[in-house]
Amino acid sequence: MYEALLKNTPEYQKIAASLASPGPAALFGLPPAGRALLYAALQKDTGRILCVVTPGEAEATHFADDLKTLGLSAAVFPPRDFMLRPVEGAGREYEYRRLSVLGALAGGRLNAVCVPAEALLQYTVPQDEFQKNTLTL
């Protein structure tokens, strides 16, 4: 219901037209729930994967939950946890989560990925290298 109303506004038409060409687009002034609704509508119209950049992991998690509620498959790409000193017991949960999101992106199972700015600045393996070293059971 809300998507139909949103798609008839001139602002939606303008941002949808700007996404027709390659490159980034920025949006300011909407509350988080409004942004999630707009992004979900744009993703459904364009069929492109959304990359939503947030200030931190908490915001990314909240945004991914909002997008899931609106019918998209979304995940959070967490930042890498650096260990600069020897530690007795270090978990690899964040590494596994990062690999899981990369695998879902490479496999086409995600409509959106929410990325904290810190994670966006960290290196990842190139897609062809990732797929070459992936084993599906």
Give short role names for the model-derived ranges:
Residues M1-L137:
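ASCE RecA-like P-loop NTPase motor cores
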